[in-house]
A protein has these predicted regions:
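Substrate-binding/active-site clefts of carbohydrate-active enzymes
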Residues: 1-68, 84, 134
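Flexible glycine/proline-enriched surface loops and loop-helix/loop-strand junctions
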Residues: 5, 141, 244-248
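Glycine- and acidic
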Residues: 9, 42-43, 189-197, 245-253
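Short, solvent-exposed loop/helix junctions and linker helices
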Residues: 10-17, 53, 142, 204, ...
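Conserved alpha/beta catalytic core and glycan-binding cleft of carbohydrate-active enzymes
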Residues: 32, 48-50, 54-225, 229-230, ...
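Carbohydrate-interacting/catalytic domains
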Residues: 199-208, 213-386
């Protein structure tokens, strides 16, 4: 039962493998599908008796060698329901994109306020080179890391900041189903009923922080439909059996959360307009890590970090990102010459001041910037024509 649902196929049986290949080819030829995402894809790496040890899955090899399937996008959830975890170079599909569960959990824990997470967040923003090494033997690329915080499995983005506990009673399994460890934080109030205005505002700010970190990280960003307007499943983190308002997209929330939708849309546009963020290789010498000052504090108690990303190699602007994951207001000092920098993103501000066009922002007047608790600031320095 490696799928958790009792219907696992032995994918490396030659007849089953042929069925899978024929099905994929049919979808590409007849349905013009240009990509596939494989749930619990580590099942591919199981022997017939369920043991692990295949150096390369015959099915994955067949997909790689197929002239039709070789050109489509392949995405793996690189684990299964029985404990096999193959994130990054451990997965047999060397060119596959992979859902990065470490990114999800580390970013959740940092935004939640867990201690000891600064070093992990640095690694995730950099492109998760611990999982996707680009040495000669592995030859991975950071874009293979699918960076996400929420998906169809588990909480929505809004529920991630609105619930501490799962609320799956409607599923009929006495609230025992669904993930127990969600690394969520409700901002001081469980659910929406009676939630104070200050709690609701903090939730929006935390959701913007999640959006920021996903969009600023090297790799391939992913979010779930509805997260861009704070859709909710009312705390249900396993609504597989719900064909009702629990699992449906509530389009009224788009109307109610236009300000957040604006922020989300502009963050996507910001990423697309700055190729220095999403590279085929890691940032390497183009990035410099800082804390509130020149040196980064990676102690267990630290919740702050910053980084400068030189955009020259991509003919892009320079970026300076300041991240305050702690409760208290913090003063960050820009570790670059002051000239030319403008503040374009500040999750501590209300809309529309939370994200602005470069032309609408004044030059910085000081190297010292005060960041509210649990907020992210992004500075941009346009590149002057040569």
């Amino acid at each position: 039962n490696f799928s958790g649902t009792g219907n696992t196929l032995h994918c490396n049986n030659r007849y089953v493998s042929r069925m899978v290949l024929d099905s994929l080819r049919s979808w590409v030829q007849l349905g013009h599908v240009n990509g596939f995402r494989f749930d619990l894809a580590s099942v591919f790496n199981r022997h017939v008796d369920g043991s692990v040890g295949l150096e390369d899955s015959p099915l994955v090899s067949a997909i790689r060698a197929d002239p039709l399937l070789g050109g489509v996008r392949l995405i793996a959830e690189p684990w299964d329901a029985a404990g096999l975890y193959q994130l990054g170079s451990a997965f047999p599909g060397k060119r596959w994109f992979q859902w990065n569960g470490k990114f999800r959990d580390d970013i959740r824990r940092f935004v939640k306020g867990d201690q000891g997470m600064v070093a992990a967040v640095m690694c995730r923003l950099y492109g998760s080179d611990d999982a996707f090494p680009d040495d000669l033997f592995n030859a991975c690329h950071p874009y293979q890391s699918v960076n996400y915080v929420n998906s169809h499995d588990g909480y929505t983005l809004y529920d991630q900041v609105a619930y501490n506990e799962r609320h799956n009673w409607a599923n009929g399994e006495e609230n025992r189903d669904g993930h127990r460890d969600n690394f969520s934080w409700n901002c001081g109030w469980e659910g929406d009923v009676g939630a104070p205005a200050a709690v609701l505002r903090l939730r929006r700010q935390q959701a913007k922080n999640f959006c920021c970190l996903v969009m600023l990280a090297n790799g391939t960003p992913m979010f779930c439909a509805g997260d861009e307007f704070l859709n909710t499943q009312f705390g249900n983190n396993n609504p597989y059996c719900q064909d009702n308002e629990i699992s449906w997209l509530d389009w009224q929330r788009l109307e109610d959360n236009r300000d957040f939708h604006r922020f989300f849309s502009k963050m996507i546009a910001f990423r697309k307009s700055h190729p220095t963020l999403a590279r085929s290789r890691f940032w390497r010498e183009d990035v410099r890590w800082h804390g509130t000052g020149a040196d980064i504090d990676m102690s267990f108690e630290s919740h702050q970090l910053a980084f400068y990303l030189d955009g020259a190699a991509e003919n892009d602007a320079d970026l300076y990102v300041m991240i305050n994951g702690g409760w208290q207001q913090q003063t960050f000092t820009l570790q670059q010459p002051l000239s030319g920098w403008r503040r374009v993103i500040d999750t501590g501000r209300d809309s529309p001041g939370d994200i602005l066009e470069l032309a609408d922002t004044p030059p910085l007047a000081s190297k010292e910037l005060s960041l509210d608790g649990r907020s992210i600031v992004v500075l941009v320095r346009p590149r002057r024509p040569a």
